[in-house]
Every structure is written in structure tokens, then in C-alpha cells.
Amino acid sequence: MKTPIRFTALALSILLTSGFAAAADLKIGVSMSQFDDAYLTTVREYMLKQASSYPKGDGVQLQFEDARADVVKQLSQVENFISQKVDAIIVNPVDTASTARISKEATEAGIPLVYVNRRPDQKDLPKGVAAVTSNDEEAGRMQMQYIADKLGGKGAIVILLGDLANNSTTNRTKGVKEVLAKYPGIKIEQEQTGAWLRDRGMTLVSDWLTQGRAFNAVISNNDEMAIGAAMALKSVGTKPGSVLIAGVDGTQDGLNAVAKGDLAMSVFQDAKGQGDGAVEAARKMAKGETIEQNIVIPFKPITADNVKDFK
């Protein structure tokens, strides 16, 4: 589906801090769900690089705000962008089920809106709203198929879930379970949320080990929790690779963990593709160009055999 958007003649430059610079610049406000997320930090860095890549007279400046995982704070940031009369808004939503008001306020103000990394839960986005995301179910399927093949279709797994308010958690896990349905010999021993955090992943796996729970693999919704799981297993003397661990994101730490054998695999979520795509989509929308409303950046599996290709 394509969505038409409004025209503005503004262009040039980039702003890294709060507030905007020259009045002639095309201004884009960006609200990120949280700055302390490893993957989203990489997305943010690529957004900055993309914004700085445009030629003089046709560039943009970005104003980043940290919502600190607070839905109310994020809405307030969007409202501030609207009051500043920015040319476009990019949002990495805190809660994918709570984006309707953000979309409503932006569209009523006539300001193009792009969601990045996390797509709102609603099936159809309003006119003037676009999303640059990846198919999270695909990531879950890639993880589980790799692990199922390595286990020979038999064994026990545990699942580390991300933030339960995030549909990436729901959809990645849905993909995992779609594959599991083909392998009745693989059972889920435990399934709990680690909220995307390394220390939470480590704590959960440590607790399961203390409880005497036996499992052959850890399926994690992201690399950070997967690395935490590897740390927990190492702390009790488990030989690396004897319990298979799969993550998602392909962060630098995740790639290093695959290269060292701490993770059996990860799934590359293209931070550059998402960051570049969001800035370019917002820029085109602000200039009145028509773009695809749903831009999907593909996932790619990472194993010891190809990890060097992602570094």
C-alpha cells in the first residue's frame, strides 16, 4: 500500500542534540523507546549517519528524545514535536499496543509519522503513517528451525521472552512455536520474560539451573538475554556449546558470542536497514513523495560459518 504525504521545501544538515538549528533545515523529531537498549543504540547511530549523508540543500536535522520505556513520556515527546512544527516524526514505540493516540495526533497535525523497528499492533496504518520494521515471526522461525535441526527433533528448551508490551516478543515467540509444532519431540521446559536485558536473562537461567531443570537449548528473543544465558551456564561449569543458545539482533556483542561459540546462532536484524530506511522514509514523506507504507527489512541467520560476513 502506498500513502501520499504533504510537501515541505525545507532541507539541509543534522542536529545531534535537543532543539533544532537553522530554520531552513528539514526537521525530524525522533522518540526512541529507550536509549540504553544495545540494538536500538545501533539503530540510532545509523539514523545519524544517514541524516548526515544527504547533500547540502537536501538534508535533514534530527532531534532525538529518550522515552525511557514510558508510554506517557513518549506521547508527551510527540506532542512537543508537533508544537515545534517539525516536518516529520519518527517513533520507536514503547508499547506497540498504545500507538493509536500518537498516530492520531500526528495525522491531525498533518505531520508525517514513521514507526521504526517496532510496528504498531493495528493491522492497517492511517494515511500519512508508515512503518520500517522486520518480520519478527521470520526471526523466530529461523532460530527454532536451526535448533530443531541441531537437536535432531528431540529435547527440551527454555524460552527467554522480551518485553511483554512489545509485539516483537509476541511475534518472535509465535515463529518459534510455529516450528515447534512440527517437532513433538521437543518440549518447552520454561518460558519467562527477561525484558530484553542481559542480567535478567542470566538470572532466569541461573534460577532454572538451581531448580534442577534440564534443557538442551535456550531460545532468546534477543542477543542480550542470550548472552546472559551463556554467562549463567558458564558460571556452573557448563561446556560452551553443550547447551545450544540462539539469539536475535546480531549486535556486536552477539556476533562476538557466536564467533566464540557462546551462542550457537543469532538472527541478524538489520539496524542499518531500519535506521536508514526510517530517515529516508520520513524525509520523502516530508517532501510530499509517495512511499510504501509498510517497509520490511529482512532477517538473516548468523552461525559460526558466516559470522565473519556480518562483522
Identify the meaning behind each predicted range.
Residues 22-311:
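A residue-level marker of the well-folded mature domains of exported/periplasmic proteins
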